[in-house]
């Protein structure tokens, strides 16, 4: 066998081995670049076990992480977006909706459920950032209001996980109207003395940060989450100055008093259960095992 044949044979073996590995088995951490086993990362709640980077998480995964198994009942699932304005930019709005629905399996960018958290009845909502950047539109506002109404009916707390780029431009004024609509609904929660906990994840921007995301009785953020109205690049171009390191990150915001707590995802469920038991004057709930209880600790770091 000639030297060229030996090289070609090695190349064929390598290609055969690569072809045998299905796509999506491995992924790379956006922060440290570590190659991670996808199944292990999912067990770790999308938190890198090497550097503790909190990756983006789907809305349903967040709600399943929070609520007791078997207690989840979805709210407003029948609501679907409509292209009332027949809006078109580089692509028709209805085509963007169809593509987002196909990619995510969701009808719109917010999922709401009622259930229990360690035995306590609660209502929870979560934004799906993969659906058009988690943008707030008519269905998002309607589902959030449905969640508030359910909390009022059940006389229980509401928890919302925000992850959004802001109002959806394709719905124009109707999307901006959701800021007032959701804020007015939350005012009813306040009148009734029912707790509303807002959890800000990466990113929480625009109209969502200017309305429901910052109206919590307690505002909690995940580590290094980008939180603000306009993005850092837009601000730099406007003021023509370099922004300080970590500007608009959760650590910067808690230093300035804009949020109340930073909580790591592995202990988020237990932290929320503890806070809600105090706010509702209920006994400390017994710990119910969940996915969060089996999460690996990052190297050289403890729960904070």
Swiss-Prot record:
A biological process from GO: fatty acid biosynthetic process
Note on how the cofactor is bound: Binds 1 zinc ion per subunit.
Q: Which UniProt keywords apply?
A: ATP-binding, Cytoplasm, Fatty acid biosynthesis, Fatty acid metabolism, Lipid biosynthesis, Lipid metabolism, Metal-binding, Nucleotide-binding, Transferase, Zinc, Zinc-finger
Q: One matching Pfam family, short form?
A: Zn_ribbon_ACC
Judged by the first EC level, this protein's enzyme class is: transferase
| Protein family | Belongs to the AccD/PCCB family.
Q: Which PANTHER family match?
A: ACETYL-COENZYME A CARBOXYLASE CARBOXYL TRANSFERASE SUBUNIT BETA, CHLOROPLASTIC
Q: Which InterPro entries match?
A: AcCoA_carboxyl_beta, Acetyl_CoA_COase_Trfase_b_su, ClpP/crotonase-like_dom_sf, COA_CT_N, Znf-ACC
Q: What is this protein called?
A: Acetyl-coenzyme A carboxylase carboxyl transferase subunit beta
Q: Which GO terms describe its cellular component?
A: acetate CoA-transferase complex
Q: In which pathway does it act?
A: Lipid metabolism; malonyl-CoA biosynthesis; malonyl-CoA from acetyl-CoA: step 1/1
Boundaries of each CoA carboxyltransferase N-terminal domain copy?
25-294
Listed under subunit, the entry gives: Acetyl-CoA carboxylase is a heterohexamer composed of biotin carboxyl carrier protein (AccB), biotin carboxylase (AccC) and two subunits each of ACCase subunit alpha (AccA) and ACCase subunit beta (AccD).
Please give the superkingdom of this protein's source.
Answer: Bacteria
